[in-house]
């Protein structure tokens, strides 16, 4: 059966969405192509019609993860006032909902350690996503007058990612909540975001 190019593109997108979810949940080394294909409603045999290898799938799924993150934050980017934009990012990123949605949240706190050990091409792709997020954070920082908004965005992103990663990693729910709340309070105070909501 020959499928239209539109059908093939939709199928490929479905596989990428499932792969992105699975990689976030289990890490790139612990996912199985057969399982991803089954969750996408396809057979394992159809995989190679869409991807050359598991590594190629992982590389493209990274792009899907960052595109999902961009789509979720588009409303925040459009908020206008730079303090409100920054506060909205911080509120979302350091929320219990984001902490608890490992399979749908930002890939940085979940996968940074995994991709640090990946092939150079995969790390480069992940790095492109990191730069994209940092660049979006740099916009309100520049509007707030930070001379080196790029450097400031790197520091802010590292604190956000670290806060969520540690909150996810600890076994004590109270400590996890405290990690989020304390990181949030520190960032809000540092950037003067108390009144911005």
Where do the language-model regions lie?
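Hydrophobic alpha-helical connector segments
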Residues: 60, 74-105, 153-156
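N-terminal intrinsically disordered/low-complexity leader segments
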Residues: 1-10, 194-197
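Short, basic, alpha-helical segments at the C-terminal edge of helix-turn-helix-like DNA-binding modules
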Residues: 63-69
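Solvent-exposed, amphipathic alpha-helical segments
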Residues: 14, 18-25, 72-75, 159-166
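Amphipathic alpha-helical segments used for helix-helix packing
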Residues: 85-88, 99-127
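Hydrophobic/aromatic-rich alpha-helical bundle segments in the mid-to-C-terminal region
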Residues: 120-128, 141-197
